[in-house]
């Protein structure tokens, strides 16, 4: 009854959780939603007997003002992950190819294989950057979509403007490029490319962002895409009806209306992430996490995670390294104490 190829598709594995431990495994913020957002969500929940606004009209209007992009060129989805999958759906059929960096967001190959397309994973450079030259070289006549993760999850590196423009010059006009900017609010590198800056230059470019990270709304699943009309219209065609719930819409809108307060929270992360990285021997990052490559330690990534878990700190281990969320000074001090107790 079930497609035989599904047995070959990996299941997405979330970060570990433990109510008694410090959870630094899923790149969540430590702050609860803003009081105004919490109130808006509570009011929306009281009307849960009604369907949400399927067009997400009010939130798209606010996003239009925030991004400087017409509302008609914005699609809102059940997290940016859903929009990643929708991008694969609108571009690919079985036998087509999708290029993406690796290691990167672990759901990319899952989304690709679900529609029967072929994942083409391009290794990062030795210092953890998207290898744009290699990604461009990996494009074939079968390629329909390219994901570029900026900042890259889990290495925390960014894509520089000049390098991205050179990359786009090599990409065929009929191949869609998705610039995944889930952690963009944490970026302080002035040379970083942002999709909003060049959207009008490329009819095959779409940007992806989320309310799950810096906005602190991971539990209500709201993300958004912005790009040319043709791509946004197609994304809306394959979207699950009423897929963005009313509670999430209300929380996202209230958060956008209090952006200054939210950005203060991101500054807490920026203020401590280099100190955390230097203490544990991780690379500096432009996101709310740091990355320890496997080759930089004598312990395996899974041994590192196990030792920290013994001190009630949960981190995310991959075969290629360990990713550790950075939140604020208090939790960072707790992390570093656990690190010293484990590895000093």
UniProtKB/Swiss-Prot annotation:
Tell me yes or no: is Cell membrane among this UniProt entry's keywords.
Answer: no
> Catalysed reaction(s)?
an aromatic L-alpha-amino acid + 2-oxoglutarate = an aromatic oxo-acid + L-glutamate
Which residues are connected by disulfide bridges in this protein? none
**EC number(s) on file:** 2.6.1.57
Subunit-level organization: Homodimer.
HAMAP family xref list: HisC_aminotrans_2 (MF_01023), Phe_aminotrans_2 (MF_01513)
What protein does this entry describe?
Aromatic amino acid aminotransferase
Which organism is the protein's source?
A: Corynebacterium diphtheriae (strain ATCC 700971 / NCTC 13129 / Biotype gravis)
């Amino acid at each position: 009854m079930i497609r035989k190829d599904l047995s070959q598709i990996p299941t997405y594995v979330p970060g570990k959780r433990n109510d008694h431990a410090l959870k630094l495994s899923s790149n969540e913020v430590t702050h609860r939603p803003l009081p105004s957002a919490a109130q808006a969500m509570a009011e929306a929940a009281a009307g849960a007997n009604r369907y949400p606004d399927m067009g997400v009209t009010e939130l798209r209007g606010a996003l239009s003002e925030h991004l400087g992009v017409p509302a008609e060129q914005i699609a809102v989805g059940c997290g940016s992950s859903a929009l990643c999958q929708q991008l694969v759906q609108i571009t690919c059929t079985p036998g087509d190819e999708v290029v993406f960096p690796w290691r990167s967001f672990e759901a990319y190959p899952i989304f690709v294989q679900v529609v029967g397309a072929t994942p083409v994973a391009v290794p990062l450079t030795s210092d953890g950057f998207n290898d744009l030259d290699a990604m461009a070289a990996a494009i074939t006549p079968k390629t329909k979509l390219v994901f570029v993760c900026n900042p890259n999850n889990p290495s925390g590196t960014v894509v520089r403007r000049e390098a991205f423009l050179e990359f786009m010059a090599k990409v065929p006009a009929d191949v869609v490029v998705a610039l995944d900017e889930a952690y963009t609010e944490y970026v302080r590198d002035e040379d970083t490319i942002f999709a909003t800056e060049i959207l009008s230059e490329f009819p095959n470019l779409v940007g992806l962002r989320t309310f799950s990270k810096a906005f602190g709304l991971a539990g209500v699943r709201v993300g958004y895409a912005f790009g040319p009309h043709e791509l946004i219209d197609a994304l809306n065609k394959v979207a699950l009806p009423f897929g963005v719930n009313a509670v999430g819409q209300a929380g996202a809108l209230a958060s956008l209306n209090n952006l200054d307060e939210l950005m203060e929270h991101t500054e807490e992360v920026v203020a401590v992430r280099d100190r955390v990285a230097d203490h544990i021997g991780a690379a500096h990052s432009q996101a709310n996490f740091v990355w320890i490559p496997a080759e930089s330690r004598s312990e395996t990534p899974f041994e590192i995670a196990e030792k920290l878990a013994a001190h009630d700190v949960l981190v995310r281990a991959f075969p290629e390294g360990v990713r550790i969320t950075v939140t604020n000074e208090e939790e960072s001090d707790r992390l570093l104490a656990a690190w010293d107790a484990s590895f000093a």
